[in-house]
Amino acid sequence: MTILFLTMVISYFGCMKAAPMKEANVRGQGSLAYTGVRTHGTLESMNGPKAGSRGLTSLADTFEHVIEELLDEDQKVRPNEENNKDADLYTSRVMLSSQVPLEPPLLFLLEEYKNYLDAANMSMRVRRHSDPARRGELSVCDSISEWVTAADKKTAVDMSGGTVTVLEKVPVSKGQLKQYFYETKCNPMGYTKEGCRGIDKRHWNSQCRTTQSYVRALTMDSKKRIGWRFIRIDTSCVCTLTIKRGR
């Protein structure tokens, strides 16, 4: 968990360098710094462990704030939800990098870190009983998640239903970066490939199916026009049920 925390801190300061600063009056009190950021001292030195816990929570909230700013431009170009209900499926699982990312997207790490903070405030007994593995909790469908490149995807479907070519590299000021997509799909080698876990097969037909959501990526259409478009990628594995009729 220490390694995870350090990874998030490094990612956070990288975001700080890239994120645009807004007007001071938006932040309040005439400060251009992000809320919750300390310029000196350590979390442990601020009145003991309780203050450290408050500091960690504040830091986690700061991550969310930075992420909101980084995705601010994407939200401006987000499709009109009244005209396309599929816009609700928009998600951020794209990263531009010179090498394969070693961790899931920052939003996933942030959620995991918050869960860690919640667990840290529990007693050992409560924490032990809240562990899903100890409660016997299992996923209805087995899934796998991994980073893939445009070389793996090659083509995708955009929001208008057309097939576009996913560009492998994105030009930047100092060269080129590869587009990586964090995809989640049903595990073909898992125990649920023949049906969902925990479903009464006497009354239901079940199947684990991979579903998709929209992400924004650099693509080229059939007319050789290059631009940022919303495309579909695999993002989850869900269970679908149909009732069995009379035999």
Swiss-Prot record:
Q: Subcellular localization, per the record?
A: Secreted
What Gene3D superfamilies is this protein classified in? Cystine-knot cytokines
The reply on keyword Glycoprotein is yes
Glycosylated residues are: 121
Question: Where does the entry annotate site (Cleavage)?
Answer: 57-58
Q: Which residues form the propeptide?
A: 19-128
Q: Which cysteine-cysteine pairs are annotated as disulfide bonds in the entry? A: 141-208, 186-237, 196-239
Q: Which domain of life is it from?
A: Eukaryota
Signal sequence span is 1-18
Coiled-coil intervals, chain numbering: none
Q: Does the keyword Signal apply?
A: yes
The record's listing under InterPro entries reads:
Brain-der_neurotrophic_factor, Cystine-knot_cytokine, Nerve_growth_factor-like, Nerve_growth_factor-rel, Nerve_growth_factor_CS
What does the entry's PTM section describe?
Answer: Mature BDNF is produced by proteolytic removal of the propeptide, catalyzed by a FURIN family member. In addition, the precursor form is proteolytically cleaved within the propeptide, but this is not an obligatory intermediate for the production of mature BDNF. Can be converted into mature BDNF by plasmin (PLG).
Q: Name one GO cellular component term.
A: dendrite
Keywords assigned by UniProt, alphabetized: Cleavage on pair of basic residues, Disulfide bond, Glycoprotein, Growth factor, Secreted, Signal
MF term (GO), any: growth factor activity
Give the GO terms filed under biological process for this record. Answer: cell surface receptor protein tyrosine kinase signaling pathway; modulation of chemical synaptic transmission; negative regulation of neuron apoptotic process; nerve development; nerve growth factor signaling pathway; neuron projection morphogenesis
| Classification via SUPFAM superfamilies | Cystine-knot cytokines (SSF57501)
- Its primary localisation, in coarse terms, equals secreted
Similarity comment: Belongs to the NGF-beta family.
Assembly information from the UniProt record: Monomers and homodimers. Binds to NTRK2/TRKB. Can form heterodimers with other neurotrophin family members, such as NTF3 and NTF4 (in vitro), but the physiological relevance of this is not clear. BDNF precursor form: interacts with the heterodimer formed by NGFR and SORCS2. Mature BDNF has much lower affinity for the heterodimer formed by NGFR and SORCS2.
Q: What does this protein do?
A: Important signaling molecule that activates signaling cascades downstream of NTRK2. During development, promotes the survival and differentiation of selected neuronal populations of the peripheral and central nervous systems. Participates in axonal growth, pathfinding and in the modulation of dendritic growth and morphology. Major regulator of synaptic transmission and plasticity at adult synapses in many regions of the CNS.
Q: What is this protein called?
A: Neurotrophic factor BDNF precursor form
